[in-house]
């Protein structure tokens, strides 16, 4: 499967039909052939979700922590043949969700006692830059297993330790890391459209050997960890940008899991 078959174009995202057997998560990514640099992960996140939804016949999609910035508008979701339900723990964030989208308020790492919880109610669950803020990620994965229908798929996209840039964010006091991020990215100031939340990085790693046993304990029949290296935090710092890029290119070439910067962690629930 080429990325052309997963393309979202212009104001009208569209998934072009492909005639392929269901296959496995690994074979899906083998055919897509992601680049090593994390820019690919950012650029192709929506297309990857649509590709997975198409390949595995997934229609009812829950976006975890999507409150203020949902994956698609209602029109985009409809055009791509999916029913999008936006989840968040915070009612204030859900109040910012686009018009027409369904919402579900519950804590993905909680006890799933909230009225909006629908066990086995989703064909797919996705999240982008959420899991690094979750306290209790292993429980979150167990809950995802409960919330997915048989054969359902989940994808979590998050930053990973111990990439130096995120290791620094992890060890610095929150007040200091806030100040650094606000200086580099003014749009992420408090009250803006993309505020910075405290990051815990629980189970946010890019090492398949570390993650897969935990995901199997959560009950998943199939797992895939797509690793990425590189980032854009030094783009406005000539010299440092080039050194960092060379470091990450080398790490990607040798497959150094310890310093991945981002990962797509993708799981599939058994059909039984």
Regions flagged by a language model, labelled:
Residues 32-36, 128, 196-202:
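Surface-exposed cleft-lining segments at the edges of enzyme active sites
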Residues 124-136:
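A short SAM/SAH-binding and catalytic strip from SAM-dependent methyltransferases
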Residues 134-135, 148-150:
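Helix-to-beta-strand junctions that scaffold the AdoMet/dcAdoMet cofactor pocket
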């Amino acid at each position: 499967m080429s990325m052309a078959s997963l393309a979202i174009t212009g104001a009208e995202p569209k998934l072009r039909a492909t005639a392929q057997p269901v296959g496995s998560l690994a074979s899906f990514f083998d055919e897509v052939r992601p680049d090593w640099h994390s820019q690919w992960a950012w650029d192709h996140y929506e297309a990857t979700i649509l590709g997975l939804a198409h390949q595995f016949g997934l229609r009812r999609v829950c976006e975890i922590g999507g409150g203020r910035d949902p994956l698609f508008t209602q029109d985009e979701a409809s055009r791509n043949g999916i029913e999008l339900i936006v989840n968040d723990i915070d009612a204030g964030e859900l109040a910012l969700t686009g018009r027409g989208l369904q919402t579900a308020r519950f804590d993905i790492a909680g006890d799933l006692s909230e009225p909006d919880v629908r066990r086995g109610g989703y064909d797919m669950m996705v999240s982008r830059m959420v899991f690094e803020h979750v306290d209790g990620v292993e429980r979150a994965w167990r809950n995802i297993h409960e919330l997915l229908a048989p054969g359902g798929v989940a994808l979590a996209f998050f930053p990973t330790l111990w990439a130096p840039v995120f290791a620094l964010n992890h060890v610095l006091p929150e007040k200091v890391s806030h100040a650094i991020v606000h200086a580099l990215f003014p749009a992420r100031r408090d009250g803006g459209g993309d505020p910075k939340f405290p990051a815990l990085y629980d189970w946010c790693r890019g090492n398949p050997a570390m993650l897969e046993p935990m995901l199997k304990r959560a009950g998943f029949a199939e797992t895939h960890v797509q690793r990425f290296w590189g980032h854009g935090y030094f783009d406005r710092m000539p010299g440092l940008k080039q050194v960092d890029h060379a470091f990450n290119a080398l790490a990607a070439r040798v497959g150094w899991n310890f310093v991945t910067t981002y990962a797509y962690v993708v799981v599939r629930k058994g059909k039984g």
